[in-house]
Regions:
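Alpha-helical scaffolds flanking conserved acidic
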Residues: 266-267, 305-306, 469-470, 608-611
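N-terminal accessory alpha/beta regions
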Residues: 64-270, 274, 279-290, 295-297, ...
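Active-site substrate-binding loop specific to GH73 endo-beta-N-acetylglucosaminidase modules
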Residues: 26-37, 176-182, 186-195, 199-242, ...
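Sec/Tat signal peptide C-region and signal peptidase I cleavage site
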Residues: 21-25
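Flexible, low-complexity segments enriched for small/polar residues
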Residues: 26-39, 43-47, 52, 56-66, ...
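Bacterial N-terminal signal peptides that target proteins for export
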Residues: 1-11
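Bacterial N-terminal signal peptides
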Residues: 10-20
């Protein structure tokens, strides 16, 4: 049996062994063992367990040295730091990596101009937009224009344009003219590290000439070995809009793995899912970077009312839930100079109450949904497909009287009608309870004690929705520091991948490949179609198929088979329990230890990488 077959066989045996253990590790349903669970939430953790619990819940998993640091400065001081991220010094290495990701700092209009989508490509092809000056972008657009014209010709039943119809498309020089024979051999036959060294050594003009001379397949084959800046150039040549997606994925993984402001990153993920928008929906491809940068990240520990308004006025949300097209029902279409029929759209009004504030059982009716939708008519985007910002059009607003949850909003109002709705919802007791429960489900347990949720909700109402104060109430509670919460949640794919990289102290050169792994495990980042966002319930992420993928990921990571992620497992040795104490800061359960011992015995591959992979893929590591 060859090495590849042996590897696959050992992987399968491991998964078959750990599946029963993971299944038994699922927490009981709410109706089961209720008395036992209530007692567990009364039992206090030891001091050492409290440190591990804080690092498991308030970070994407501990780095080597984190436990010692928390013990040294004290748990209270460490929590205070995490609750005040603006006072912390960020990891300078992370900041340097993020600096390369230019689209994250651009306005939507700048993003469109630098990384155009199909609409702008067509505009340039038809002479309505100028060709950009940037050499790589120009080459990409010329290629895309040719593809567009070929499709046009095919649709019209005409002959395709001749190859020289766009002379600029043809490479000025071939690869043989640009590269030396040795360089050509490295590009075609070298291993990833040899290719990376060559790419990093090339001057920028030669590098650009080479990438332009390559076809799309050749550039794609080079992608795995390319460092981050060159990967972005490859994306730019293949499809400019891919750069924006690349930057989003790269930054999200880098921040989760490397940021010192771990709680802020946890909350960024929480709030983005709470106010979810879908990357693949039209203009949201270039609106999301601004959305996360300006509507989500500044408010993760701020006032909920500010966060609510920031998302309500964000072009990304207005576009995703179609509110930019919502107008008063009696609108005179001739006044708007539009041929497309428009009317009242209730999507945002419904999701605002059901998902963003009150919750599905929050006490609203269908009549309230309609009234809220009327209040937000006229809230739109200035030229949405051209990167415009929030724009209120009074001509499209319904000026009649509305009644929302028993509150009368007088006739004759304007944009303030929607703002009044946000006020009503932000201070509503149902919102306080719903938000508190969602936070408790993320950070405490899938079924958090109602007593804790009520305490958090009281703080929410007393502080006008201070997220920081609600989090402090949770962190000051006996329930958070109890056996009922300790290792009671299962990691989402995002948490599993990030915590694995952190536990192994991985050198993440580029977060894109890790983000792809998250997608493979079932949580493609920024691509949740439904406005619900991804679930906070850990039990929803565990099934046999998902566990197989998690074990495969662990094996790839530990054996350095994940692109642009380097780990050193030589320090671990091959004793599973010793490795578990390094990676999890605790011993394995007897069931997991027995399963791993059996897997190692059967596979005959007992080495540091295999042992580390089995620990990371084990049910014990899936818990947090």
């Amino acid at each position: 049996m060859n090495t590849r077959s042996t590897f696959l066989a050992s992987t399968l045996s491991v998964i078959l062994l750990v599946l029963p253990v993971v299944s038994s590790a699922k927490p009981p349903k709410p109706t089961e063992e209720a008395k036992l669970q209530a007692k567990l939430f009364q039992k206090k953790l030891s001091k050492d367990e409290q440190v591990l619990h804080a690092l498991d819940r308030l970070t994407f998993g501990p780095l080597p040295g984190d436990v010692e640091r928390v013990k040294r400065i004290g748990l209270k001081k460490w929590i205070f730091e995490q609750l005040h991220p603006d006072r912390m010094t960020e990891n300078p290495g992370l900041e340097a990596q993020l600096q390369v990701l230019e689209s994250l700092r651009m306005t939507p209009l700048e993003t469109l101009q630098h990384y155009p989508g199909p609409q702008m490509i067509r505009a340039i092809a038809n002479g309505k937009q100028p060709m950009p000056d940037d050499l790589l972008l120009r080459a990409s657009i010329e290629r895309l224009i040719t593809r567009y014209k070929v499709k046009q010709a095919e649709a019209a039943g005409l002959a395709a344009p001749p190859k020289d119809a766009n002379a600029d498309l043809e490479p000025v020089r071939t690869l043989e003219q640009i590269l030396t024979p040795g360089e050509l051999d490295t590009i075609r036959k070298g291993n990833p590290e040899q290719k990376r060294q060559l790419l990093e050594s090339m001057q920028q003009d030669r590098l650009e000439d080479m990438l332009i001379a390559m076809n799309q397949k050749q550039r794609t084959q080079l992608f795995g070995a390319a460092p981050s800046p060159i990967r972005r150039e490859i994306f730019l040549l293949n499809s400019p809009q891919q750069v924006v997606a690349y930057d989003l994925l790269d930054s999200k993984m880098l921040r989760a793995v490397e940021s010192t402001r771990q709680l802020a990153e946890e909350l960024d993920d929480f709030w983005f899912n709470h106010f979810n928008v879908f990357y693949e929906k039209g203009a949201d491809r270039f609106l999301i970077p601004q959305y996360e940068r300006e509507a989500i990240r500044p408010h993760v520990l701020g006032q909920f009312r500010d966060l609510l308004e920031a998302t309500a006025k964000s072009p990304a949300m207005l576009f995703f839930l179609d509110n930019f097209e919502s107008v008063r029902p009696d609108i005179d279409l001739n006044d708007t100079k539009r041929k497309v029929k428009r009317g009242l759209n209730e999507n945002y009004g419904r999701e605002l109450m059901e998902l963003h504030t009150l919750g599905v059982n929050g006490g609203y009716t269908q009549k309230d949904v309609t009234e809220v939708a009327r209040c937000f008519t006229g809230w739109g985007i200035q030229e949405p497909r051209k990167g415009g910002g929030f724009f209120y059009n009074d001509k499209l607003h319904d000026k009649g009287q509305k009644v929302v949850l028993g509150h009368v909003i007088a006739a004759g109002g304007g944009m303030e009608d929607g703002e009044q709705v946000l006020d009503i919802l932000a201070r509503h007791p149902s919102t306080a309870h719903f938000i508190s429960k969602e936070l408790a489900q993320r950070f405490v347990a899938d079924n958090p004690p109602e007593q804790l949720v009520n305490k958090m909700a009281q703080t929410f109402l007393a502080t006008n929705g201070s997220i920081r104060e609600v989090m402090k109430t949770m962190l000051d509670s006996k329930e958070f520091w109890s056996e009922g919460a300790y290792r009671a949640k299962m990691k989402s794919p995002f948490e599993m991948v990030a915590s694995s990289a952190r536990a192994l102290n991985a050198n993440v050169i580029d977060g894109w490949a890790l983000a792809n792994q998250v997608g493979t495990l079932g949580e493609p980042l920024y691509r949740k179609l439904e406005p619900t966002g991804y679930s906070n319930l850990g039990t929803e992420w565990i099934n046999s198929s998902a566990l197989l993928e998690r074990m495969n990921f662990a094996l790839q990571l530990a054996q350095n088979h994940v692109e642009s992620v380097k780990v050193d497992v030589s320090r671990f040795g091959d004793d599973p329990n010793a490795v578990a104490k390094i990676l999890m800061f605790r011993s394995m359960s007897p069931q997991t230890r027995a399963a791993i011992d059996k897997a190692l015995e059967d596979s005959k591959q007992k080495n540091a990488a295999m042992v580390a992979a089995l620990v990371i893929g084990s049910p014990d590591f899936q818990k947090r």
